[in-house]
């Protein structure tokens, strides 16, 4: 049987993931409540999302729901268990999923660095122009304005004297 996922959400009390789906054979919309057991404010959201998605009981229903979306819903659930408001949890997710250009990536631990790199890879893939894109241009020439004065740096002039 084929199920088409329409909406996916989270219920905080008692903790559960809720999926609104359409049964392809009947064409009826239905709601599936998947209880979340053994999840605390210290739980790993990635692991919990993988376990729910790979659970044989829910697997066929969650085929069209991305792992990232389930992870995000588990982060909301964990934030609720930690006593955070929805706004605080959304702000935390926003901080974790965006890259600050001024952030020093050398100071991050391996796990955080891997997370930042995966975010950068996703952004690159999303923004990358491919040959089959309608707005793709093979040889782009860009002219830079020559009116502005070139700024020199102190180390530029120092290195010229050494040679």
Curated annotation (Swiss-Prot):
GO terms for biological process: cilium assembly; microtubule anchoring at centrosome; vesicle targeting, trans-Golgi to periciliary membrane compartment. Pfam families: CEP19 (PF14933). It comes from the Eukaryota. It is found in: Cytoplasm, Cytoskeleton, Microtubule organizing center, Centrosome, Centriole; Cytoplasm, Cytoskeleton, Spindle pole; Cytoplasm, Cytoskeleton, Cilium basal body. Keywords: Cell projection, Cilium, Cilium biogenesis/degradation, Cytoplasm, Cytoskeleton. GO terms for cellular component: centriole; centrosome; ciliary basal body; cilium; cytoplasm; spindle pole. Coiled coil: none annotated. Its main location: cytoplasm. Required for ciliation. Recruits the RABL2B GTPase to the ciliary base to initiate ciliation. After specifically capturing the activated GTP-bound RABL2B, the CEP19-RABL2B complex binds intraflagellar transport (IFT) complex B from the large pool pre-docked at the base of the cilium and thus triggers its entry into the cilia. Involved in the early steps in cilia formation by recruiting the ciliary vesicles (CVs) to the distal end of the mother centriole where they fuse to initiate cilium assembly. Involved in microtubule (MT) anchoring at centrosomes. PANTHER family: CENTROSOMAL PROTEIN OF 19 KDA, CENTROSOMAL PROTEIN OF 19K CEP19. Belongs to the CEP19 family. Interacts with CEP43; this interaction is required for its localization to the mother centriole. Interacts (via residues 121-150) with RABL2B. Interacts (via C-terminus) with CEP350; this interaction is required for its localization to the mother centriole. This is Centrosomal protein of 19 kDa. It comes from Rattus norvegicus (Rat).
């Amino acid at each position: 049987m084929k199920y088409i996922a329409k909406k996916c959400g989270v219920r905080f009390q008692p903790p559960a993931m809720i999926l609104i789906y359409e049964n392809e054979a009947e064409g009826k919309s239905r709601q599936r409540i998947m209880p979340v057991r053994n999840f605390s404010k210290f739980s790993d959201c990635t692991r919990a999302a993988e376990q729910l998605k790979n659970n044989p009981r829910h697997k066929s229903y969650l085929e069209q729901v991305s792992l990232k979306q389930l992870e995000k819903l588990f982060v909301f659930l964990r934030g609720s268990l930690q006593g955070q408001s929805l706004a605080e949890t959304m702000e935390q997710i926003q901080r974790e999923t965006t890259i600050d250009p001024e952030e020093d990536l050398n100071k991050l631990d391996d796990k955080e660095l891997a997370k930042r790199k995966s975010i950068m890879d996703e952004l690159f893939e999303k923004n990358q122009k491919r040959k089959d894109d309608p707005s793709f241009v093979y040889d782009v020439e860009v002219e830079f304005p020559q009116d502005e004065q070139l700024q020199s740096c102190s180390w530029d002039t120092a290195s010229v004297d050494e040679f």
